[in-house]
A protein has these predicted regions:
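Alpha/beta-hydrolase active-site loop
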Residues: 108-129
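N-terminal cap/lid segment of alpha/beta-hydrolase-fold proteins
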Residues: 33-60
Length: 269
């Protein structure tokens, strides 16, 4: 399993001769970690001014890039922050996917700056790992940016969008997030970035899969994952997996199921 990573106090630098639009790779490190016969390679770089982390199998043909959109209070290290995240990321990397995450302005709640960053991250990752196939994987708050990018037509080829306890309604966030959302989105502008207010055909022909805990008091499934499926499901393919258990939301990080679903999308497109 991929070990939990912490923000390094000191970083070894090596130049990367890549320049893409506003993307400047200013520093990167890579290291290998052998676990259960799998060797991982970590890439550290800066994209659009934001720290970014990529994890892939060393010397392994990359079948697709998975762009991970982190939750509130997290950053690019979230995909290895604890056992559920680490196990999910390991399953994806072991199956041949490169998983890439960005700090993306922290608690940006899908604002224009974070969307631009993720757009550049997708293009940079696809170029670096030499693949045209990209999947979106969002966690909580990250679904706001992911959904908006998917609706506007990203420059990369997105084969599928998966999300874990996704937040899709900026007007129905938990009380602890209300002040942050209000600061980022004055009342007159929130509708332009709120996925639940997009036209019903905004995700036409898109394939999506959501892992949602119906008992989660912070991210209510009926106001987010299932409400989103009800609004957009007539023109797109959306499946919602209930993942409630005594371990809280940990059971929603289903790496093996993600690998299976991503593989199904690869066959379809």
């Amino acid at each position: 399993m991929i070990a939990s990573m912490q923000r390094p106090a000191r970083r070894t630098s090596s130049s990367l001769l890549v320049l893409l639009l506003c993307v400047v790779m200013v520093a990167a490190t890579s290291c290998a970690n052998r676990q259960k016969g799998v060797e991982y390679e970590y890439l550290r770089l800066t994209v659009d001014g934001q720290e970014t982390l990529g994890i892939a199998g060393k010397d392994k043909l990359i079948r697709a890039v998975v762009i991970y959109f982190h939750d509130a209070g997290d950053d690019e290290f979230a995909m290895t922050a604890d056992e559920p995240h680490s196990a999910m990321t390991s399953a994806l990397v072991n199956a041949g996917f490169a998983v890439v995450a960005s700090k993306a302005s922290g608690d940006a709640w899908g604002n224009s700056v974070s969307q631009r960053n993720y757009l550049y991250v997708g293009g940079t990752a696809a170029q670096h790992y030499r693949t045209e196939s990209v999947f979106f994987l969002a966690d909580g708050m990250g679904a706001i940016a992911a959904a908006n990018l998917l609706a506007t037509g990203p420059t990369v080829r997105v084969r599928g969008f998966a999300a874990i306890n996704p937040i899709f309604n900026l007007k129905a966030v938990a009380p602890q997030y209300e002040s942050t959302v209000a600061r980022i989105y004055p009342s007159a502008s929130i509708g332009s970035k709120n996925p639940m207010e997009l036209p019903p055909t905004a995700f036409k022909f898109r394939d999506m899969r959501f892992y949602s805990n119906p008992d989660d008091p912070v991210v209510r499934s009926d106001a987010n994952a299932r409400a989103f499926a009800a609004r957009f499901g007539s023109t797109s393919s959306i499946s919602v997996v209930d993942c409630a258990s005594k371990d809280g939301n940990a059971s929603c990080y289903q790496g093996d199921d993600l690998v299976k679903w991503f593989a199904e999308q690869e066959k379809r497109s």
